[in-house]
Amino acid sequence: MGSFGVRSLVHLTSFGPQFADLLNYPPLSVYSNGKALPVRQFLRENPERYAPHFILQFHKGAALKFQDQSYTAPVANKIILSWDVLNSELPLDHGYFEYAKKNHATALLISGVSGIQQEENLDAKLKEIARLLEGFSQETMVYCECGPFFLKDGYGKYFKELGGKSDIIACSDEELFEINGVSHSSFGGNPYMLMDLLDKFFHTYHPRRGVVIHSRDVSMYYGNPLPEGRDVKSALAMGNMVASAKARYSDYGTREMVFSIADQPDSTVGLQRIKTLEKGGVIAVPTKPVEHPACTIGLGDSFTAGFLSCV
């Protein structure tokens, strides 16, 4: 969000010298002891607390070797190696939430719990986050996404605890299938199945407004209307463009990068699927797919940034 000019305040769990360049955008600040500090100042004033995740990206047909065994990747995907204690414990600064309330934040994104790998840690942390979400005014949109994928039923626990305290809950289409116990291979592009899963997701976890789903060909919103002045269709379109910019340039995306995507053709699959989805009350926008992407990591995060910048 900082890279394309949206003023944002972040809560950092892990940080070190590597963050100085990655997050050094004027609109972006870091919360520290009741203040919003520029990233470099925050890093100067706080001792390093660095705990990286390693993400290995590979293409369809790639040979993957683990010790004496070899596999051929059937699809492009990635392997996430997370070994640190810090992100699994996820220490939270409660002052960040109070600062957001006091300053009437337009939106509050709840994410980053995906590093939690112990069930007892997850249960305690979700209860803590739920308490911290109490007392926000209606002008702050609480957006909850990216569940704890290392744990069995992690997504279910996550949305069960936080769904009712959120305006919007969000995930990818693959996560939607997993949450509902449905095999992605059984989907076959069936928009009616997609509508059933959206409806089940919405009515199981009871967000105050609705659910957002992003996928390769179409992004979707299903639920109650958003407050006046919040245009969900524009937000979905912006999310799609920011994700495509990340795929094309392997970068967070300046305004110029993002808007260079605007003239790209819409997904033909998405255009076909939308006709049926809209009849079922789903607001849907086709994506702008990038052939031969330079990067496939963090596209969901980029979509979220684009969506929140407009809504």
Regions flagged by a language model, labelled:
Residues 307:
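Active-site-proximal C-terminal subdomain of hydrolase catalytic domains
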Residues 2-294, 311:
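Ribokinase/PfkB-type carbohydrate-kinase core domain
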Residues 300:
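Conserved single-residue anchors adjacent to enzymatic active/cofactor-binding motifs
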Residues 297:
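Catalytic tyrosine of NAD(P)H-dependent dehydrogenase/reductases that use a Tyr as the general acid/base
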